[in-house]
Amino acid sequence: MMTALLRCCGKGYAFSVINMANIVTCKTKDGETVQYVDEVIGSGSMKDVYFSPDKSYVVAFYHKPQNEQARDRIDMITGRYRQNIFGQSGGEYWKDLFCWPTHVVEHGHKIGIVVPTYKSYFFFKYGSKNDDFLGIKGREKEGKWFASASNQNKFLDPRERGNTLTYLKVCLLLTRAVRRMHAAGLCHSDLSYKNVLIDPEMGHACIIDVDGLVVPGKYPPDVVGTPDFIAPEVVKTSHLSKEDPNRVLPSITTDRHALSVLIYMYLFFRHPLRGGKIHDMSDEVRDETLSMGEKALFIEHPTDKSNAVKVSQLSSFSLPWADLEKIPYTIMGPYLTPLFERAFIDGLHDATKRPTADEWESALVKTVDLIQPCQNKACEQKWYVFSGKTKPVCPYCGTPYKGKLPVLNLYSSRKEGSYRPDDHRLMVWSGQSIYAWHVNRLIAPNERTTDAQRKRVGYFVFHNDQWWLVNEGINGLMSLPDKRQIAIGEKIELTNNAQFVLSKEEGGRLVVVQLVEN
């Protein structure tokens, strides 16, 4: 017996305990044999869910008969669209980032889908505080648990909360998944913390509830989204009929808004639009519609402070995260800051200006390379993004950096012997690694990265009051200007203004060291 704690196929499940009831065997539409234990383990607004005997997948049957268009969409999602994503080069990579239906099954006048069960790290290992007083240990890590400072501080065991580095990894994976979905011409339409699972402890993420994906112009959305994540133009026109040409429905551009909100919430644990401004004191529904729609305003707008959060009205559980003076969005560094501005200032009411998932992915990759461990061992966040200042300070606990801090400025070749700045830096800390994508600009860390490219090729170490790069697998490592070859197994010292070549191939990198001392 075990408690069923899946939510991969609908909303608001009531869960029950599995008894080993009858095992039902049936065929999928494409001829595969599937089995399920004939006892409902989860029932939501759309489906009833059953475990397979080995619990490696679930079978979810829709409550209501599906019309022809809905059946066609399910067939396409489990068929062609799934093949286009998982059947391509690097397709295996996406199995960890999507809980994607694999088959359609019809049995006893019911239609359903077969969906993989969640990975073990998407279930709470420790649960809530005070010996799991909420009883959530073993339940799935729905993204909403982690999206507000108040939720985390009030309820979650500190071991479940993660830190700045793991949340950057979570955001990177979510962004990568959305990028792939959009590249296939699909949009989620309900991208929110209710439809993602995240594991902040290790930095995992997965998009769920994909059986309702929207194909613009072919399959319309079943829902307009989840409050907090619906784009302002969708909220603003929600009173209009779906047939009205002025009605804005979910699309890839509205997904971009939802993705930006998710990233902001997972990095700052607050909502970018929920501030102190009230638009209608007498009508709460109208006030909400204006705040999230026509009158939506970034709480950190640089010139219009009317929606700024009123710190005096905040619960202590929300602090310091809700205090915009202490933790502004700019602490995330030079790559994410302009994207937040495009998402919530320039693009909030102009969808064409919103950052794409590709742009978020690129900025997050560069930001992860700017991460620096806090020297205060008691710092809850443990890491922070290097600000570019000569006297860096952890924005979370206020601890200044002490000692020598090497920053590697990356340049790459467009033609042999000619290097241009890449607007990309790599912070150095003891144990920090160099990978193939640092050696060569033409290699990107994504689903196409080979196993060989995922292996580190060098690492940094602080020894005898000096910083060193140890060469583990860089064949072309060469110091300048003496052009001395640094063989595998040897090391090169990182001194101020030192230069060395990582690769002379096309796209190969040149490094210029900047040494900050405090």
Annotate each predicted stretch with a short phrase.
Residues 37-38, 45-104, 109-112, 119-161:
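ATP-binding glycine-rich loop module of kinase domains
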